[in-house]
Regions:
Chain B
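Alpha-helical transmembrane segments and their helix-start/interface "positive-inside/aromatic belt" motifs
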Residues: 2-17, 97-98, 129-147, 186, ...
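Extracellular/periplasmic helix-loop-helix junctions in multi-pass membrane proteins
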Residues: 254-258, 329, 367-371, 392-407
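Central hydrophobic cores of alpha-helical transmembrane segments
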Residues: 373-383
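Membrane-interface transmembrane-helix boundary segments in multi-pass integral membrane proteins
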Residues: 6, 260-266, 331-351, 399-423, ...
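Hydrophobic cores of alpha-helical transmembrane segments in multi-pass inner/ER membrane proteins
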Residues: 110-115, 147-148, 194-205, 268-283, ...
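Transmembrane-helix bundle segments that line or gate the permeation/cavity pathway
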Residues: 26-44, 103-215, 234
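Extramembrane terminal tails and long inter-domain/linker segments of multi-pass membrane proteins
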Residues: 1-91, 162-183, 209-228, 290-297, ...
């Protein structure tokens, strides 16, 4: 079903922030906001849920720590406990100080890389992905707010958006799903 | 203006009195002769576990010698006497060490707060101005704490007590290594250095506070610029003197041992304690309604510093430990062998208190804003760093005769009471939030 979306373009992040507040106060649904740079507090005024990526990172770190511990315990203690320079390979804890640098690095490695990959997957970013950019100016100096026109009166909505400081307003037929 | 509540004053005085009584009783109950040591050891069933294991080989040699002919018997007797003498010295050192550790612990909080204060000026931080008066209050302890510290150092450096082995001329006469270090480690030069360090720190503290108070009555940035300059100068002075202070006041307890990153290690512990104390006093004052301008974000920043410096401390602790453990050079590794054999629980326990606890509790951004979380972690961190100083000092002075009993706890009580009294009295001397600083407005509106 083809839905209609209104694209309102702003040229200042402060005006955009105020516009977002007003639009939300009028209970219109904001589909998306496109900005050329991070606007501090935009997620808060849009009412977006906080990210959980730090929690995933912590869990990945624990995985990395486990991998390091299990790997070195198997290799250095269980599989072939050689005497290497007199280091005590009787138990993992007896030789632990020499394993700590690797435990630390693998924790960081897993936490960092898996978190980045999670970020790419969750935000659907990969090479050769088709850019979802409604207006190329939003990567330079313009801000675009996409509002679901839905069952609203388009005339009234456009007038309202003008009062929030939009410099351009256009009605878009949104028939492709991305 | 903050007024010292009479309840808090009473609280501090009670702690000081109880502590003082305990300290005196600690000195009175310390044994004076080897006969008393023998009695005490018999009464306590050879003390605690680590004590017994340490003494077992000595007793064995003593009994085997006793079975031998008469000339061997005398040997046995003298070796037992030597052992008792050794234990006597350890037990006599205990109340002194307990006093020294508590004194240094609270002194280093004030010193760390002073360094942190100077860093805030030199870095032109934009969040901490509303906390400056709290920091100034904490650094007020630098003067009385430093004077007590100096007296203790003088008593030890001139061998009134046996805390520093290098201060005993008889020991030095038979010790080539100590003779080699005597040009640095001798009573006079030791005290001259201590006077220079303490004098420099107190001088900066005096002028930093004076400039800060002066700026309250001005509208221009004259005093801020002066504070900035002396803070930058102080930080240079501080990093050299702090390093030497740690060799003198802590590392020289084990004068046969040395470690190059020791100064940093002491500094890291000092900074954690100072920032934790700043956070605790800030939360306390805010809860009493004196620091309305302080918001969650300020607490969050302090908690981040607590978290970060805890990890930094652990990094240095591990770097020092692991390098020595790995290379296992006999003259270096004895330091850790005595600690692991005789101080297993405090030595590894402090790692849990100073690392695991803050890392797990303060990792979450939301928890850093919850006051009781910060207070809980802060108390554990402070206790952990007391144990850290304990494990740095005690093995060299009392060895296996350690215990956390009346002398240790009383010393903590006494200096805690003094610290509270001095800090909160100092807080009444000036408005609790400064009036004029170019970053003040930013700090008041600080939001993270």
């Amino acid at each position: 079903m083809a839905s209609k979306v209104i694209h309102a373009i702003y040229n200042d992040d402060d005006i955009l922030m105020n516009a977002v507040k007003k639009v939300r106060a009028e209970r219109y649904h904001i589909e998306e906001v496109y900005t050329p740079f991070p606007v501090h507090g935009l997620d808060k005024v849009m009412g977006l849920a906080p990210t959980r990526i730090a929690i995933t990172s912590f869990l990945y770190g624990l995985v990395g720590l486990s991998v390091a511990t299990l790997m070195m315990n198997f290799i250095m203690i269980e599989d072939w406990p050689q005497n290497i320079g007199g280091k005590p390979s009787f138990s993992y804890i007896a030789n632990m100080p020499s394993f700590v640098p690797i435990m630390f690095e693998l924790t960081v490695f897993f936490a960092a890389h898996l978190m980045v990959i999670t970020f790419y997957m969750r935000s659907k970013l990969w090479p050769f992905k088709k850019a979802e950019n409604p207006d190329p100016r939003t990567t330079d100096d313009h801000f675009l707010m996409a509002i679901d026109a839905g069952h609203h009166d388009v005339e009234k909505l456009s007038k309202f958006l003008h009062t929030t400081g939009a410099i351009e307003i256009s009605l878009i037929d949104n028939d492709e799903d991305h | 203006m903050y007024t010292l509540p009479s309840k808090l004053k009473l609280f501090a005085i009670v702690f000081m009195v109880i502590g003082a009584i305990g300290i005196v009783s600690g000195f009175l109950t310390a044994p004076k002769t080897t006969a008393e040591v023998k009695e005490m050891m018999a009464a306590h069933g050879d003390g605690h576990g680590s004590d017994a294991s340490h003494e077992a080989p000595h007793h064995e040699t003593a009994t085997t010698h006793e079975a031998a002919p008469s000339e061997g018997h005398q040997d046995a007797h003298s070796s037992e006497e030597a052992h008792l003498e050794h234990t006597l010295h350890q037990m006599q050192n205990r109340p002194w060490s307990a006093l020294y550790i508590a004194c240094f612990f609270f002194f280093m909080i004030a010193l760390g707060a002073l360094a942190f204060y100077a860093i805030q000026f030199a870095a032109q931080a934009g969040w901490s101005q509303v906390l400056f008066r709290v920091m100034e209050g904490i650094t007020a302890y630098l003067v009385p704490g430093g004077i007590i510290m100096f007296v203790l150092l003088a008593l030890s450096g001139f061998h009134i007590n046996h805390l520093f082995v290098w201060a005993d001329p008889e020991v030095v006469a038979h010790d080539k290594l100590l003779q080699g270090k005597a040009s640095w480690l001798n009573g006079t030069w030791f005290l001259v250095r201590a006077a220079i360090f303490l004098g420099g720190w107190m001088l900066y503290r005096h002028f930093a506070v004076k400039f800060s108070r002066n700026s309250d009555d001005e509208t221009d940035n004259r005093w801020f610029k002066k504070s900035f300059k002396i803070s930058a100068g102080f930080l240079v002075f501080f990093i050299y003197t702090e390093s030497m202070m740690s060799w003198d006041w802590i590392m020289s307890f084990d004068p046969h041992w040395f470690s190059t990153l020791f100064g940093w290690y002491v500094l890291a512990g000092m900074m954690v304690c100072a920032i934790t104390t700043i956070a605790l006093i800030t939360i306390f004052l805010k809860s009493k309604g004196y620091l309305e301008v302080v918001n969650d974000s300020h607490i969050h920043d302090l908690a981040k510093f607590m978290f970060g410096f805890s990890i930094f401390w652990t990094y240095l602790w591990f770097s020092q430990f692991m390098l020595i453990w790995y290379a296992n050079i006999p003259e270096e590794v004895t330091y850790f062998i005595t600690r692991i054999e005789q101080y297993k629980l405090p030595f590894f326990g402090m790692l849990a208190m100073n690392f695991l606890f803050p890392v797990l509790l303060l990792m979450n951004s939301d928890y850093k804003r919850v006051n009781w979380f910060v207070v809980l972690t802060g108390i554990v961190i402070l206790a952990g760093h007391y144990v850290d100083i304990f494990v740095m000092v005690m093995p060299a002075t009392v060895g296996s005769s350690w215990y956390i009993g009346i002398p240790e706890i009383s010393s903590i009580f006494f200096f805690f009471g003094l610290f509270i009294y001095v800090v909160f009295t100092a807080l009444t001397k000036a408005p609790i939030v400064m009036k004029n600083n170019p970053f003040l407005k930013e700090s008041k509106q600080y939001h993270y």
